[in-house]
Protein backbone atom coordinates (compact mmCIF):
# COMPACT_ATOMS: atom_id res chain seq x y z
CA UNK A 1 0.00 0.00 0.00
CA UNK A 2 1.12 3.55 -0.79
CA UNK A 3 -0.03 6.68 1.05
CA UNK A 4 -0.07 10.05 -0.70
CA UNK A 5 -0.56 13.31 1.19
CA UNK A 6 -1.48 16.62 -0.37
CA UNK A 7 -2.08 20.11 1.01
CA UNK A 8 -5.59 19.20 2.18
CA UNK A 9 -6.35 15.52 1.61
CA UNK A 10 -4.63 12.17 1.65
CA UNK A 11 -5.13 8.95 -0.26
CA UNK A 12 -4.44 5.26 0.21
CA UNK A 13 -3.36 3.39 -2.91
CA UNK A 14 -3.88 -0.36 -2.66
CA UNK A 15 -0.84 -1.42 -4.68
CA UNK A 16 2.92 -1.40 -4.24
CA UNK A 17 3.66 -0.12 -7.75
CA UNK A 18 2.47 3.26 -9.02
CA UNK A 19 3.47 5.06 -12.21
CA UNK A 20 4.73 8.64 -11.66
CA UNK A 21 1.97 10.16 -13.82
CA UNK A 22 -0.73 8.50 -11.70
CA UNK A 23 0.98 9.55 -8.47
CA UNK A 24 1.09 13.13 -9.71
CA UNK A 25 -2.63 13.15 -10.51
CA UNK A 26 -3.52 11.79 -7.06
CA UNK A 27 -1.28 14.38 -5.38
CA UNK A 28 -2.86 17.20 -7.41
CA UNK A 29 -6.33 16.06 -6.37
CA UNK A 30 -5.26 15.94 -2.71
CA UNK A 31 -3.98 19.51 -3.09
CA UNK A 32 -7.54 20.74 -3.74
CA UNK A 33 -9.41 22.12 -0.68
CA UNK A 34 -12.48 19.92 -1.25
CA UNK A 35 -10.34 16.77 -0.93
CA UNK A 36 -10.19 17.34 2.83
CA UNK A 37 -13.80 16.18 3.20
CA UNK A 38 -13.30 12.92 1.29
CA UNK A 39 -11.97 9.49 2.17
CA UNK A 40 -9.88 8.73 -0.91
CA UNK A 41 -9.06 5.13 -1.77
CA UNK A 42 -7.33 4.14 -5.01
CA UNK A 43 -7.77 0.65 -6.46
CA UNK A 44 -4.92 -1.72 -7.51
CA UNK A 45 -5.68 -1.27 -11.24
CA UNK A 46 -4.85 2.44 -10.97
CA UNK A 47 -3.50 4.22 -14.03
CA UNK A 48 -3.43 7.78 -15.29
CA UNK A 49 -6.53 9.22 -16.94
CA UNK A 50 -7.52 12.67 -18.14
CA UNK A 51 -7.19 14.93 -15.11
CA UNK A 52 -7.54 12.09 -12.58
CA UNK A 53 -6.68 8.44 -12.13
CA UNK A 54 -8.73 5.48 -13.28
CA UNK A 55 -9.37 3.41 -10.16
CA UNK A 56 -10.36 6.33 -7.93
CA UNK A 57 -12.96 6.04 -5.16
CA UNK A 58 -13.89 8.77 -2.72
CA UNK A 59 -16.69 9.79 -0.41
CA UNK A 60 -18.71 12.81 -1.56
CA UNK A 61 -20.13 15.50 0.71
CA UNK A 62 -20.57 19.11 -0.37
CA UNK A 63 -18.67 19.17 -3.67
CA UNK A 64 -18.37 17.00 -6.76
CA UNK A 65 -16.07 17.11 -9.79
CA UNK A 66 -17.96 15.83 -12.88
CA UNK A 67 -14.69 15.02 -14.64
CA UNK A 68 -13.71 12.59 -11.89
CA UNK A 69 -16.83 10.55 -12.63
CA UNK A 70 -15.83 10.88 -16.27
CA UNK A 71 -17.46 11.14 -19.67
CA UNK A 72 -18.76 7.57 -19.94
CA UNK A 73 -21.19 7.93 -17.06
CA UNK A 74 -22.64 4.63 -15.85
CA UNK A 75 -20.36 2.45 -17.95
CA UNK A 76 -20.25 -1.13 -16.75
CA UNK A 77 -20.61 -4.83 -17.46
CA UNK A 78 -23.78 -6.89 -17.77
CA UNK A 79 -23.01 -10.55 -17.06
CA UNK A 80 -25.57 -13.07 -18.33
CA UNK A 81 -25.28 -16.75 -17.44
CA UNK A 82 -26.69 -18.78 -20.32
CA UNK A 83 -28.62 -22.05 -20.23
CA UNK A 84 -26.75 -23.22 -23.32
CA UNK A 85 -23.43 -25.07 -23.00
CA UNK A 86 -22.42 -24.64 -26.63
CA UNK A 87 -22.65 -21.71 -29.03
CA UNK A 88 -21.77 -21.36 -32.70
CA UNK A 89 -19.14 -18.65 -32.14
CA UNK A 90 -18.61 -17.65 -35.80
CA UNK A 91 -22.38 -17.29 -36.19
CA UNK A 92 -22.60 -15.22 -32.99
CA UNK A 93 -19.71 -13.03 -34.11
CA UNK A 94 -21.34 -12.41 -37.48
CA UNK A 95 -24.70 -11.67 -35.86
CA UNK A 96 -23.20 -9.12 -33.47
CA UNK A 97 -21.33 -7.33 -36.26
CA UNK A 98 -24.51 -7.14 -38.34
CA UNK A 99 -26.90 -6.09 -35.56
CA UNK A 100 -24.93 -4.17 -32.90
CA UNK A 101 -23.38 -0.90 -34.16
CA UNK A 102 -20.07 -0.14 -32.47
CA UNK A 103 -17.46 2.58 -32.13
CA UNK A 104 -18.67 5.81 -33.71
CA UNK A 105 -21.59 4.05 -35.42
CA UNK A 106 -25.17 4.29 -34.16
CA UNK A 107 -28.46 2.80 -35.30
CA UNK A 108 -30.11 4.03 -38.50
CA UNK A 109 -33.31 4.35 -36.49
CA UNK A 110 -34.08 4.16 -32.78
CA UNK A 111 -34.48 0.70 -31.27
CA UNK A 112 -38.09 -0.07 -30.36
CA UNK A 113 -37.16 -0.11 -26.65
CA UNK A 114 -35.85 3.47 -26.55
CA UNK A 115 -39.18 4.56 -25.06
CA UNK A 116 -38.36 2.82 -21.76
CA UNK A 117 -36.50 6.04 -20.90
CA UNK A 118 -37.49 9.64 -21.58
CA UNK A 119 -34.43 11.69 -22.50
CA UNK A 120 -36.41 14.81 -21.60
CA UNK A 121 -35.94 13.87 -17.94
CA UNK A 122 -32.44 15.32 -18.30
CA UNK A 123 -32.22 18.80 -16.82
CA UNK A 124 -29.56 19.65 -19.41
CA UNK A 125 -31.61 18.21 -22.28
CA UNK A 126 -31.18 21.36 -24.40
CA UNK A 127 -27.43 20.73 -24.42
CA UNK A 128 -27.56 17.24 -25.95
CA UNK A 129 -28.35 15.63 -29.30
CA UNK A 130 -31.65 13.88 -28.58
CA UNK A 131 -31.85 12.02 -31.89
CA UNK A 132 -28.32 10.67 -31.55
CA UNK A 133 -29.02 9.68 -27.95
CA UNK A 134 -32.02 7.57 -28.92
CA UNK A 135 -30.20 5.98 -31.85
CA UNK A 136 -27.25 5.13 -29.58
CA UNK A 137 -29.27 2.76 -27.42
CA UNK A 138 -28.30 -0.80 -28.24
CA UNK A 139 -24.79 0.08 -29.44
CA UNK A 140 -21.29 -0.83 -28.31
CA UNK A 141 -18.63 1.74 -27.43
CA UNK A 142 -15.14 1.77 -28.90
CA UNK A 143 -11.79 1.40 -27.13
CA UNK A 144 -11.89 -1.26 -24.42
CA UNK A 145 -15.64 -1.90 -24.65
CA UNK A 146 -16.51 -5.44 -25.67
CA UNK A 147 -19.02 -8.25 -26.06
CA UNK A 148 -17.61 -11.69 -25.26
CA UNK A 149 -18.49 -15.22 -24.23
CA UNK A 150 -16.69 -16.51 -21.13
CA UNK A 151 -16.58 -20.13 -19.95
CA UNK A 152 -16.06 -21.27 -16.35
CA UNK A 153 -14.43 -24.48 -15.11
CA UNK A 154 -17.81 -26.22 -15.00
CA UNK A 155 -18.54 -25.50 -18.64
CA UNK A 156 -21.09 -22.74 -18.02
CA UNK A 157 -21.18 -19.96 -20.60
CA UNK A 158 -21.58 -16.26 -19.84
CA UNK A 159 -22.43 -13.43 -22.19
CA UNK A 160 -20.58 -10.32 -20.97
CA UNK A 161 -21.45 -6.88 -22.34
CA UNK A 162 -19.20 -3.93 -21.49
CA UNK A 163 -20.45 -0.56 -22.71
CA UNK A 164 -21.78 2.70 -21.31
CA UNK A 165 -23.70 5.88 -22.04
CA UNK A 166 -22.10 6.61 -25.42
CA UNK A 167 -22.12 10.15 -26.86
CA UNK A 168 -24.90 11.26 -24.52
CA UNK A 169 -22.72 10.60 -21.46
CA UNK A 170 -19.93 12.62 -23.06
CA UNK A 171 -22.23 15.58 -23.72
CA UNK A 172 -23.68 15.57 -20.20
CA UNK A 173 -20.25 15.30 -18.57
CA UNK A 174 -18.76 18.09 -20.69
CA UNK A 175 -21.70 20.39 -20.01
CA UNK A 176 -21.47 20.05 -16.24
CA UNK A 177 -17.67 20.30 -16.19
CA UNK A 178 -17.98 23.58 -18.10
CA UNK A 179 -20.54 24.79 -15.55
CA UNK A 180 -18.14 23.82 -12.77
CA UNK A 181 -15.22 25.65 -14.35
CA UNK A 182 -17.23 28.84 -14.78
CA UNK A 183 -18.48 28.59 -11.19
CA UNK A 184 -14.87 28.33 -10.00
CA UNK A 185 -13.88 31.48 -11.87
CA UNK A 186 -12.87 30.05 -15.22
CA UNK A 187 -9.74 31.44 -16.85
CA UNK A 188 -9.74 34.41 -14.48
CA UNK A 189 -8.24 32.13 -11.83
CA UNK A 190 -5.32 29.73 -12.02
CA UNK A 191 -5.62 27.83 -8.74
CA UNK A 192 -8.10 25.20 -9.97
CA UNK A 193 -7.39 23.36 -13.24
CA UNK A 194 -10.32 22.81 -15.60
CA UNK A 195 -10.30 19.04 -15.02
CA UNK A 196 -10.72 19.48 -11.24
CA UNK A 197 -13.30 22.27 -11.17
CA UNK A 198 -16.17 21.38 -8.84
CA UNK A 199 -19.88 21.88 -8.33
CA UNK A 200 -21.70 22.76 -5.11
CA UNK A 201 -25.23 23.61 -4.02
CA UNK A 202 -28.02 23.51 -6.62
CA UNK A 203 -25.61 22.90 -9.50
CA UNK A 204 -24.30 19.81 -7.74
CA UNK A 205 -27.84 18.53 -7.22
CA UNK A 206 -28.67 19.12 -10.90
CA UNK A 207 -25.60 17.13 -11.88
CA UNK A 208 -26.45 14.27 -9.51
CA UNK A 209 -29.94 14.11 -11.00
CA UNK A 210 -28.64 13.88 -14.56
CA UNK A 211 -25.83 11.53 -13.57
CA UNK A 212 -28.38 9.10 -12.12
CA UNK A 213 -30.39 9.33 -15.34
CA UNK A 214 -27.27 8.51 -17.32
CA UNK A 215 -26.72 5.41 -15.20
CA UNK A 216 -30.18 4.21 -16.22
CA UNK A 217 -29.44 5.10 -19.85
CA UNK A 218 -26.23 3.03 -19.82
CA UNK A 219 -28.06 0.15 -18.14
CA UNK A 220 -30.78 0.22 -20.81
CA UNK A 221 -28.12 0.28 -23.51
CA UNK A 222 -26.62 -2.96 -22.20
CA UNK A 223 -30.04 -4.53 -21.71
CA UNK A 224 -31.06 -3.83 -25.31
CA UNK A 225 -27.83 -5.39 -26.59
CA UNK A 226 -28.53 -8.46 -24.45
CA UNK A 227 -32.08 -8.77 -25.75
CA UNK A 228 -31.01 -8.37 -29.38
CA UNK A 229 -28.39 -11.13 -29.01
CA UNK A 230 -30.54 -13.57 -27.02
CA UNK A 231 -33.51 -13.16 -29.36
CA UNK A 232 -31.47 -13.30 -32.55
CA UNK A 233 -29.35 -16.28 -31.51
CA UNK A 234 -32.18 -18.14 -29.73
CA UNK A 235 -30.22 -18.16 -26.47
CA UNK A 236 -31.72 -18.30 -22.97
CA UNK A 237 -30.79 -16.42 -19.80
CA UNK A 238 -30.47 -18.32 -16.54
CA UNK A 239 -29.49 -15.32 -14.40
CA UNK A 240 -27.69 -12.00 -14.74
CA UNK A 241 -26.10 -9.21 -12.73
CA UNK A 242 -24.61 -5.77 -13.42
CA UNK A 243 -21.28 -4.30 -12.34
CA UNK A 244 -21.07 -0.54 -12.86
CA UNK A 245 -18.16 1.89 -12.81
CA UNK A 246 -17.88 5.66 -13.51
CA UNK A 247 -20.70 6.80 -11.25
CA UNK A 248 -21.69 8.07 -7.83
CA UNK A 249 -23.54 5.70 -5.51
CA UNK A 250 -25.97 8.33 -4.23
CA UNK A 251 -27.31 6.07 -1.48
CA UNK A 252 -23.90 5.92 0.19
CA UNK A 253 -22.38 8.98 -1.56
CA UNK A 254 -19.34 7.13 -2.86
CA UNK A 255 -17.83 8.14 -6.19
CA UNK A 256 -16.26 5.37 -8.25
CA UNK A 257 -14.15 6.20 -11.30
CA UNK A 258 -13.00 2.97 -12.92
CA UNK A 259 -13.98 1.12 -9.74
CA UNK A 260 -16.96 -1.00 -8.73
CA UNK A 261 -19.10 -1.56 -5.67
CA UNK A 262 -18.09 -4.48 -3.42
CA UNK A 263 -20.64 -4.33 -0.62
CA UNK A 264 -20.86 -7.43 1.61
CA UNK A 265 -22.40 -10.28 -0.36
CA UNK A 266 -22.59 -8.28 -3.59
CA UNK A 267 -21.78 -10.15 -6.79
CA UNK A 268 -19.45 -8.44 -9.25
CA UNK A 269 -17.38 -9.05 -12.35
CA UNK A 270 -13.78 -7.94 -12.87
CA UNK A 271 -12.56 -8.37 -16.47
CA UNK A 272 -8.83 -8.93 -16.95
CA UNK A 273 -8.03 -8.82 -20.67
CA UNK A 274 -9.00 -10.34 -24.02
CA UNK A 275 -7.06 -13.54 -23.31
CA UNK A 276 -7.65 -14.28 -19.63
CA UNK A 277 -11.35 -13.44 -19.38
CA UNK A 278 -12.93 -12.26 -16.14
CA UNK A 279 -13.27 -12.96 -12.43
CA UNK A 280 -16.69 -13.46 -10.84
CA UNK A 281 -16.38 -12.24 -7.25
CA UNK A 282 -18.33 -11.53 -4.08
CA UNK A 283 -17.81 -8.33 -2.12
CA UNK A 284 -16.60 -8.42 1.49
CA UNK A 285 -17.92 -4.97 2.42
CA UNK A 286 -14.54 -3.53 3.46
CA UNK A 287 -15.17 0.02 4.69
CA UNK A 288 -11.50 1.01 4.41
CA UNK A 289 -11.72 0.26 0.68
CA UNK A 290 -14.84 2.46 0.37
CA UNK A 291 -16.75 -0.81 -0.18
CA UNK A 292 -15.09 -0.96 -3.61
CA UNK A 293 -12.99 -3.13 -5.91
CA UNK A 294 -11.07 -2.57 -9.16
CA UNK A 295 -13.04 -2.59 -12.40
CA UNK A 296 -10.35 -4.42 -14.36
CA UNK A 297 -6.65 -5.16 -14.59
CA UNK A 298 -5.54 -1.61 -15.38
CA UNK A 299 -3.32 -0.50 -18.23
CA UNK A 300 0.47 -0.73 -18.08
CA UNK A 301 0.95 1.78 -20.89
CA UNK A 302 -0.87 4.31 -23.04
CA UNK A 303 -2.55 3.34 -26.29
CA UNK A 304 0.15 5.20 -28.23
CA UNK A 305 2.93 3.32 -26.44
CA UNK A 306 1.13 0.01 -26.96
CA UNK A 307 0.94 0.52 -30.72
CA UNK A 308 4.69 1.09 -30.87
CA UNK A 309 5.61 -1.68 -28.41
CA UNK A 310 3.89 -4.75 -29.86
CA UNK A 311 3.48 -6.29 -33.29
CA UNK A 312 0.34 -7.79 -34.76
CA UNK A 313 2.10 -11.15 -34.85
CA UNK A 314 2.82 -11.00 -31.10
CA UNK A 315 -0.82 -10.06 -30.51
CA UNK A 316 -2.02 -13.04 -32.55
CA UNK A 317 0.27 -15.43 -30.66
CA UNK A 318 -1.01 -14.16 -27.30
CA UNK A 319 -4.58 -15.00 -28.36
CA UNK A 320 -3.80 -18.51 -29.59
CA UNK A 321 -6.69 -20.90 -28.90
CA UNK A 322 -9.29 -18.15 -28.41
CA UNK A 323 -11.91 -17.46 -31.07
CA UNK A 324 -11.98 -13.79 -32.05
CA UNK A 325 -12.17 -11.63 -35.14
CA UNK A 326 -10.97 -8.59 -33.20
CA UNK A 327 -7.22 -9.19 -33.42
CA UNK A 328 -6.15 -6.58 -35.97
CA UNK A 329 -3.54 -3.86 -36.36
CA UNK A 330 -6.15 -1.37 -35.13
CA UNK A 331 -6.64 -3.19 -31.81
CA UNK A 332 -3.03 -3.77 -30.76
CA UNK A 333 -3.63 -1.15 -28.06
CA UNK A 334 -6.02 -3.64 -26.41
CA UNK A 335 -3.77 -6.71 -26.55
CA UNK A 336 -3.34 -8.69 -23.29
CA UNK A 337 0.22 -7.46 -22.78
CA UNK A 338 -0.81 -3.83 -22.25
CA UNK A 339 -2.68 -4.74 -19.04
CA UNK A 340 -1.32 -5.55 -15.61
CA UNK A 341 -0.88 -9.30 -14.94
CA UNK A 342 -3.94 -11.01 -13.47
CA UNK A 343 -1.80 -12.40 -10.63
CA UNK A 344 -0.86 -8.89 -9.49
CA UNK A 345 -4.51 -7.81 -9.30
CA UNK A 346 -5.60 -10.99 -7.48
CA UNK A 347 -2.81 -10.54 -4.92
CA UNK A 348 -3.99 -7.03 -4.06
CA UNK A 349 -7.78 -7.51 -3.80
CA UNK A 350 -8.11 -10.21 -1.14
CA UNK A 351 -9.18 -7.67 1.48
CA UNK A 352 -12.20 -6.47 -0.50
CA UNK A 353 -13.54 -9.49 -2.45
CA UNK A 354 -13.51 -13.26 -2.64
CA UNK A 355 -13.15 -14.88 -6.05
CA UNK A 356 -15.92 -17.33 -6.95
CA UNK A 357 -14.61 -18.38 -10.36
Identify the residue ranges that each predicted region occupies.
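Domain-length cofactor-binding catalytic modules of enzymes
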Residues: 2-28, 35-42, 48-54, 63-66, ...
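Glycine-rich phosphate/pyrophosphate-binding loop regions near the starts of catalytic domains
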Residues: 57-58
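Acidic/polar active-site rim loop that often engages polyanionic ligands
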Residues: 73-82
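Acidic low-complexity segments
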Residues: 98-124
Amino acid sequence: MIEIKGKYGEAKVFTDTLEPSAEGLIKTFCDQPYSAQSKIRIMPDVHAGKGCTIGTTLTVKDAVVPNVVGVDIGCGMLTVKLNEKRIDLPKLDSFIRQNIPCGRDIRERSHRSHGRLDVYELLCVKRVDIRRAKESLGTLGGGNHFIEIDKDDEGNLYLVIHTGSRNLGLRVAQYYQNVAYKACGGRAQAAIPYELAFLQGDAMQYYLHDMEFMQRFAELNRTIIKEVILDGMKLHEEESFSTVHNYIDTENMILRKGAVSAQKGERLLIPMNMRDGSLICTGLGNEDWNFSAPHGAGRLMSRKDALSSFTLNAFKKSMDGIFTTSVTADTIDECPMVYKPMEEIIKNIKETITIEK
